[in-house]
Amino acid sequence: RYLEICIVNDKPIGFLYGKIDRYGDKGYIRPGYAYIMEFYVKTEYRRKGFATQMFGRLQSLFKKDGAKIMYLTADPITGRPFWERMGFIETDQVNPDNQMIIFEKEID
């Protein structure tokens, strides 16, 4: 599991939480996929590159630990545009936990 906090000028401005589903715990994603469970940046710090840097760090951690594909669900208004810019593609799967569309990306 990965929990990281982004700090700017000694203040937390965002965080991320992810894991690699090694055993297929979720039941609808194949084992070995990385899962971004939570990702947040305070509104006033958005569109300044912090989220992109945070995502790059998480992607590197996933890659280092052997994941080849990552997935997430995204808020259609605030999250989807960002994740599509990061290279995520909509799948035909729906997360049964939150009824949101699952997006996937090969890890660079």
Task: Map each language-model feature to its residues.
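Short acidic/polar active-site loop segments enriched in Thr and Asp
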Residues: K68, I89
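A conserved beta-turn-beta hairpin within the catalytic core of GNAT-like acetyltransferases
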Residues: D21-I36, R46, D97
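Conserved acetyl-CoA-binding loop-helix of GNAT-fold acetyltransferases
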Residues: V41, R47-S60, R85
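Residue-level detector of high-confidence beta-strand sites
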Residues: F15, T91-Q93
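Conserved beta-strand in the GNAT
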Residues: I5, K11-I20, Y35, Y40
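Active-site beta-strand termini and strand-to-loop segments that position acidic
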Residues: I7-N9, K105-I107
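Conserved beta-strand-loop-alpha-helix junction that forms the acyl-donor binding cleft
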Residues: Y71-E84, P96-Q99
